[in-house]
């Protein structure tokens, strides 16, 4: 009996979508001033590198952002809805308790019959989702997977908390992963430390028709910084070792776009020149699960990320969760 050929998951296309409303730091400072909260463009840029963010208008949902990003990724990959046999949406801000956002996207796209489900790992979500899709493709359980990171974090922010409300934006990014005979995703690592839940969480819930707990995002910024740079450094080295490459071999580092301080510190630890780090946090702010696919799409479309190059994508977020995906484009 002939042995079945090994299949790999390769990125065939990408797409991104940002809400039309752009809010600059000056815009945000003016809005917060009406609440007697003081901030400024200088204060925000110095601490985060963020200059603006896109915010969804009231009534715009995560599934709508995800659907538009998905359509753009499908166009880029040249695939039709009937070719998609798996949809995974990474989000912490779903439209509903259920059905899943992925099922809503599937209906919007006119895709039918394939698996559709959500993954919730906060800002690590896209890396978790892509690793999951990669496993299905390698196992022969899927051939064309749509992997989406989409968030409307503006709905869970406490706009009276200057330390968090300036950090986040809304958006969606997507990739199409297709089965291929040559390696695309070379290695992937996922991790979590559930003992660190309180450093970044939104601990609200809906029970018996009422919101219980605190529905807003809360973060210990210093603890998150310390954890993030430590685990991402180790994860990058581990995933490269598994793939048999050196960190120096990486053409592009695309980390979760939390803030520029984390990005720069991580680049220094890994000894990756900043010119080989894709940075979009200045324009998008922190879009949680959407940040990595959005950054990848920007870098592919502006010509920085090219076919054949080695790209390391990393996520880190609440849970505490983190992970890395190393891919040949």
UniProtKB/Swiss-Prot annotation:
It catalyses: malonyl-[ACP] + acetyl-CoA + H(+) = 3-oxobutanoyl-[ACP] + CO2 + CoA. GO terms for cellular component: cytoplasm. Pathway: Lipid metabolism; fatty acid biosynthesis. Residues 257-261 are annotated as: ACP-binding. CDD domains: KAS_III. It comes from the Bacteria. One of its GO terms (biological process) is secondary metabolite biosynthetic process. Belongs to the thiolase-like superfamily. FabH family. NCBIfam families: fabH, PRK09352.1. Catalyzes the condensation reaction of fatty acid synthesis by the addition to an acyl acceptor of two carbons from malonyl-ACP. Catalyzes the first condensation reaction which initiates fatty acid synthesis and may therefore play a role in governing the total rate of fatty acid production. Possesses both acetoacetyl-ACP synthase and acetyl transacylase activities. Its substrate specificity determines the biosynthesis of branched-chain and/or straight-chain of fatty acids. This is Beta-ketoacyl-[acyl-carrier-protein] synthase III.
């Amino acid at each position: 009996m002939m042995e079945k050929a090994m299949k790999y998951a390769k990125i065939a296309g990408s797409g991104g979508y940002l809400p039309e409303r752009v809010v600059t730091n000056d815009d945000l400072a003016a809005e917060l001033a009406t609440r007697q909260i003081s901030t400024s463009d200088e204060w925000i840029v110095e601490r985060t590198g963020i200059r603006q963010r896109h915010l969804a208008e009231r009534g715009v949902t995560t599934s709508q952002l995800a659907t538009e990003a998905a359509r753009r990724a499908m166009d880029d990959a040249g695939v039709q809805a009937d070719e998609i046999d798996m949809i995974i949406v990474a989000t912490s801000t779903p439209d509903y308790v259920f059905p899943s956002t992925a099922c809503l996207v599937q209906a919007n796209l006119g895709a039918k019959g394939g698996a559709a489900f959500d993954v919730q790992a906060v800002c690590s979500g896209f890396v978790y989702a892509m690793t999951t899709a990669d496993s299905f493709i390698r196992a022969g359980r899927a051939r064309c997977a749509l992997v989406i990171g989409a968030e409307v974090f503006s709905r869970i922010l406490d706009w009276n908390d200057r330390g968090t409300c300036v950090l986040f934006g809304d958006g969606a990014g997507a990739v199409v992963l297709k089965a291929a005979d040559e390696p695309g995703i070379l290695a992937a690592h996922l991790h979590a430390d559930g003992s660190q839940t309180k450093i970044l969480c939104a601990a609200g819930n809906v029970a018996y028709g009422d919101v219980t707990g605190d529905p807003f995002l809360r973060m210990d910024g210093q603890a998150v910084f310390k954890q993030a740079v430590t685990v991402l450094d180790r994860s990058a080295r581990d995933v490269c070792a598994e793939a048999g490459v050196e960190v120096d071999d990486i053409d592009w580092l695309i980390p979760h776009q939390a803030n520029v301080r984390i990005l720069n510190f991580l680049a220094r630890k890994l000894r990756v020149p900043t010119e080989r780090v894709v940075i979009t946090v200045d324009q998008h702010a922190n879009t949680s699960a959407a940040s990595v696919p959005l950054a990848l799409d920007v870098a592919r479309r502006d010509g920085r990320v090219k076919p054949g190059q080695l790209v390391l994508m990393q996520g880190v977020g609440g849970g505490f969760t983190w992970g890395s995906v190393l891919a040949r484009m």
